[in-house]
């Protein structure tokens, strides 16, 4: 089967979490998985992330390239892609359902979509963690009728549409995924049934209240692209 998908994963010091994601990719029932290029854009990891990624070479067509902030790493990987579709995943997620990739790609083809995403759930999270991700999923659903909203945890793009939008804004210091997804036409966006699992480390480092406030401000500034180019303190506090 000719490759139609490239997967791009920005990473920095993800030796603990990245293997979960890569193992879940190995378990996907998508028939083109063997031909799918998996690109890890590493931002100078010092914990063995690169070595762990390359240890999957006998199971995945995986390679490591230089990265940076997520937007830089994602664009770097996308520039190497020649396939029709590019899937961006965060390094700390995993795909618990082996059918997710197959179903997402089927939806992209059938509806001629530019972007597809899915729901988010917290792995072993607290009530508040689950509530915040449920709120994210709700806003994502509402956005599907108004202005598309997707996070970098799972963004499946038509590659040409991705570059027509300019790719991820590398000057953006906050919510670069939202800044990009809101440019997608509503009729070319869908939420695929299912979910990815992620951690609660964002909430642990910034606090639930701070994350809610930042999310609220993002929604309030959805028409102001300049807001996303100003330092909101996210990476300075959230970076591990």
Regions found by a protein language model. Name each.
Residues 34-44, 65-67:
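Short beta-strand/loop segment that forms part of the nucleotide-sugar
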Residues 42-50, 93-94:
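A conserved acidic beta->alpha catalytic loop
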Residues 173-180:
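Acidic donor-binding loop at a coil-to-helix junction in glycosyltransferase catalytic cores
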Residues 98-128:
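Conserved donor NDP-sugar-binding/catalytic core segment of glycosyltransferases
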Residues 24-34:
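Short, acidic, metal-binding catalytic loop of nucleotide-sugar glycosyltransferases
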Residues 65-81:
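Glycine-rich, basic loop-to-helix element that forms the pyrophosphate-binding segment
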């Amino acid at each position: 089967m000719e490759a139609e998908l490239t997967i791009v994963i920005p990473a920095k010091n993800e030796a603990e979490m990245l293997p979960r994601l890569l193992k879940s990719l190995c378990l996907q029932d998508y028939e083109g998985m063997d031909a799918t290029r998996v690109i890890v854009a590493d931002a100078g990891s010092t914990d063995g992330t690169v070595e762990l990624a390359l240890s999957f070479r006998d199971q995945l067509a995986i390679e490591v390239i230089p990265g940076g902030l997520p937007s830089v790493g994602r664009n770097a990987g996308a520039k190497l892609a020649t396939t029709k579709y590019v899937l961006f995943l965060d390094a700390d997620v995993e795909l618990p359902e082996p059918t997710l990739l197959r179903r997402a790609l089927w939806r992209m083809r059938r509806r001629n979509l530019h972007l597809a995403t899915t729901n988010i759930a917290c792995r072993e999270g607290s009530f508040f963690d689950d509530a915040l991700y449920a709120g994210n999923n709700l806003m994502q659903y509402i956005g599907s009728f108004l202005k598309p909203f997707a996070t970098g945890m799972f963004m499946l793009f038509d590659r040409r549409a991705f570059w027509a939008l300019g790719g991820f804004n590398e000057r953006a210091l906050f919510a670069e995924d939202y800044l990009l997804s809101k440019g997608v036409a509503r009729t070319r966006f869908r939420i695929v049934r299912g979910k990815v699992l992620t951690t609660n480390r964002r909430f642990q480092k910034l606090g639930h209240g701070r994350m809610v406030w930042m999310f609220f401000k993002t929604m309030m500034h959805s028409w102001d692209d300049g807001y996303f180019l100003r330092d909101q303190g996210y990476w300075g506090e959230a970076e591990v």
